[in-house]
From Swiss-Prot:
It comes from Homo sapiens (Human). PANTHER family: TRANSMEMBRANE EMP24 DOMAIN-CONTAINING PROTEIN. This is Transmembrane emp24 domain-containing protein 3. SUPFAM superfamilies: Supernatant protein factor (SPF), C-terminal domain. GO terms for cellular component: COPI vesicle coat; COPII-coated ER to Golgi transport vesicle; endoplasmic reticulum; endoplasmic reticulum membrane; endoplasmic reticulum-Golgi intermediate compartment; endoplasmic reticulum-Golgi intermediate compartment membrane; Golgi apparatus; Golgi cisterna membrane. Belongs to the EMP24/GP25L family. Residues 202-217 are cytoplasmic. Potential role in vesicular protein trafficking, mainly in the early secretory pathway. Contributes to the coupled localization of TMED2 and TMED10 in the cis-Golgi network. SMART domains: EMP24_GP25L.
Length: 217
């Protein structure tokens, strides 16, 4: 009976840990950004709360985009032009709706795909205060904290590799399209040159006979 309680508690804490790892605070989104277009997002943030923005261009053009962040008073607190990826962290000085925008207005024909991850607030403690704790429970909590940190690392690594895979796949598809078009063009050019050579050689071996006309007196 004595070993049943710690085992049940460990299972409960592990399930809670996994649930918290699956429900991060904030939002992440991948969206399409057409050429000559701008897309803005809004989030209300309390005063003194920290928020962070990570973004990366996955496909399109030179894989770059303009990005800026404005506070509720319209002041620009972050601005970068033609960035492939970047991170920005800020602690809100005033309460209100903060706006962050992505602009592709400098591009006339390149369609972009942009990914961003917007996080608000500090991460809450993994385990609530449990008052009096036995030694076994303290060791179990320490193990759960280690597992939680490892899960966060795994999630971040999976996101990073997923973005790299999407970007590499887009580049490979673009390269494949260019190679295909180039191959078709070379095939057509080769056919035209071959046909022209055949006509030229045929003209060399064609005997030109003078046309005689009978003159009737």
């Amino acid at each position: 009976m004595g070993s049943t309680v710690p085992r049940s508690a460990s299972v409960l804490l592990l399930l809670l840990l996994l649930r918290r790892a699956e429900q991060p605070c904030g939002a992440e989104l991948t969206f399409e950004l057409p050429d000559n277009a701008k897309q803005c997002f809004h989030e209300e943030v309390e005063q003194g709360v920290k928020f962070s923005l990570d973004y990366q261009v996955i496909t399109g053009g030179h894989y770059d985009v303009d990005c800026y962040v404005e506070d509720p008073q319209g002041n620009t607190i972050y601005r970068e032009t033609k960035k492939q990826y970047d991170s920005f962290t800020y602690r809100a000085e005033v309460k209100g709706v903060y706006q962050f925008c992505f602009s592709n207005e400098f591009s006339t024909f390149s369609h972009k795909t942009v990914y961003f991850d917007f996080q608000v607030g500090d991460e809450p403690p993994i385990l609530p205060d449990m008052g009096n704790r036995v030694t076994a429970l303290t060791q179990m909590e320490s193990a759960c904290v280690t597992i939680h940190e490892a899960l966060k690392t795994v999630i971040d690594s999976q996101t990073h590799y997923r973005l790299r895979e999407a970007q590499d796949r887009a580049r490979a598809e673009d390269l494949n399209s260019r190679v295909s078009y180039w191959s078709v063009g070379e095939t057509i050019a080769l056919f035209v040159v071959s046909f022209s050579q055949v006509l030229l050689l045929k003209s060399f071996f064609t005997e030109k006979r003078p046309i005689s006309r009978a003159v009737h007196s």
